[in-house]
UniProtKB/Swiss-Prot annotation:
Residues 188-208 dip into the membrane without crossing it. This is Protrudin. It is found in: Recycling endosome membrane; Endoplasmic reticulum membrane; Cell projection, Growth cone membrane. The gene is Zfyve27. It holds the Pfam family FYVE. GO terms for cellular component: axon; cytoplasm; dendrite; endoplasmic reticulum; endoplasmic reticulum membrane; endoplasmic reticulum tubular network; growth cone membrane; membrane. It comes from Rattus norvegicus.
């Protein structure tokens, strides 16, 4: 400890020498520049203003390629193809000079004719999103600045996400992660090289232009819409022709039927009422069964009132139960499960003589022979007192099931 104290108290560690040594060893501290996020937003807006003409041009090209106005897109495609195929070398140089001179002239006229607005007018109108000078002059409030920063961050995040997705897609194509897409990409490149070598430049440009306009999905969408419109315009005429043809066929069929019917004798009366009376005069078994079924299925209200008077001791619940059982039976008869026109038992085809009869239990359609078994309604779960004596028609299988 003493030796160290002596070393520090020696001439090498004198106070006059120490500041010089420290000044030589430590560099001067530099002032760190602070990061201003709002200045970044202003720079981004200036960049948007600079690139606004290019953005408008891109929007116009996309508008034409998407066939939003089919006539303009078609005229543009045809006009560009004609220019590519007909212009010679001198004409191309003239077109290039025109493309250079027109933006220069427009920029000069815009700068000359622009009105100089005072700062107070800029502050009053909040004209900060039009020109870069306005962005430098106008002072935004804190909420407006925060909103601008948030909007910038959202756009930046979306741009970075799209850029990352594009890079990943290119990486997959270059590394053959999807062989089909990679083969298509390299095949297209080789085809373009061969096309540039074999065909003139004007033909290459015409083919490229036609591919851009006619090879996208929007073109096929427009074509399908126009095709559907033409079909709708032509369909009324076709419908009129079809209606006329069907009317002629109906008229011819009626004439044939009238010719084939025998001539009535003077003693016969062929009015609808007399025909029905003649048909109902001698009903066979099937008609008798059908008539019995209809009579039993639709009882008259007078009989219901009489039964209610006779059975005065019935409660309201029993009356409701009887009505519910009748309604379910009618629904079963009205909506049979077999609607194919054949008997579910013997497969006989229903006709005027072979009438359809629905089983009151399963609801299937049978002929009068297969559905000729009568069982009381109480066997199917009906609780009304009338169900003990009322019977309904069921099929053979349901009769066996209900009889057990």
């Amino acid at each position: 400890m003493q030796s160290s104290d002596r070393d520090l108290s020696g001439p090498e560690a004198s106070p006059s020498v120490m500041p010089e040594v420290l000044s030589e060893c430590s560099p001067a501290p530099t002032k760190s520049t602070a990061f201003d996020l709002f200045n970044l937003v202003l720079s981004y807006k200036r960049l948007e203003i600079y690139l606004e003409p290019l953005k408008d041009a891109g929007d116009g090209v996309r508008y034409l390629l998407r066939w939003q106005m089919p006539l303009c897109s078609l005229l543009t495609c045809l006009g560009l193809n004609i220019l590519f195929l007909t212009l010679n070398e001198g004409a191309w140089y003239s077109v290039g000079a025109l493309i250079i001179s027109v933006p220069a002239l427009l920029g000069y006229l815009q700068e000359v004719c622009r009105a100089q607005l005072p700062e107070s007018e800029l502050m009053r109108r909040k004209y900060h999103s039009v020109r870069q000078e306005d962005l430098q002059r106008v002072r935004l409030s804190r909420p407006e600045a925060v909103a601008e920063v948030k909007s910038f961050l959202i756009r930046l995040e979306a741009f970075l996400a799209r850029l990352c997705y594009t890079c990943e897609s290119a990486y997959r194509v270059l590394h053959w992660e999807n062989p089909v897409v990679s083969s298509q990409f390299y095949g297209a490149l080789l085809g373009m090289v061969c096309m540039l070598y074999l065909l003139p430049l004007c033909w290459v440009l015409a083919l490229l232009n036609s591919t851009l306009f006619l090879g996208n999905g929007e073109f096929f969408r427009v074509v399908s819409e126009y095709r559907a419109c033409l079909q709708r315009r032509m369909s009324p005429k076709q419908e009129e022709c079809v209606c006329e043809g069907s009317a002629l066929q109906d008229a011819g069929g009626r004439a044939v039927v009238l010719d084939s019917t025998p001539a009535p004798t003077p003693t016969e009366d062929l009015t609808p009422g007399s025909v029905e009376e003649a048909e109902e005069a001698e009903p066979d078994e099937e008609f008798k069964d059908a008539i019995e079924e209809d009579d039993e299925g639709t009882p008259c209200p007078a009989e219901d009132e009489l039964t209610m008077q006779d059975n005065g001791f019935l409660s309201k619940n029993e009356v409701l139960r009887s009505k519910v059982s009748k309604l379910t039976e009618r629904l079963r008869k009205r909506y049979p499960t077999n609607n194919f026109g054949n008997c579910a038992g013997c497969a006989a085809t229903f006709s005027v003589l072979k009438k359809r009869r629905s089983c009151s239990n399963c609801g299937n359609s049978f002929c009068s022979r297969c559905c000729s078994f009568k069982v009381p309604k109480s066997s199917m779960g009906a609780t009304a007192p009338e169900a003990q004596r009322e019977t309904v028609f069921v099929c053979a299988s349901c009769n066996q099931t209900l009889s057990k």
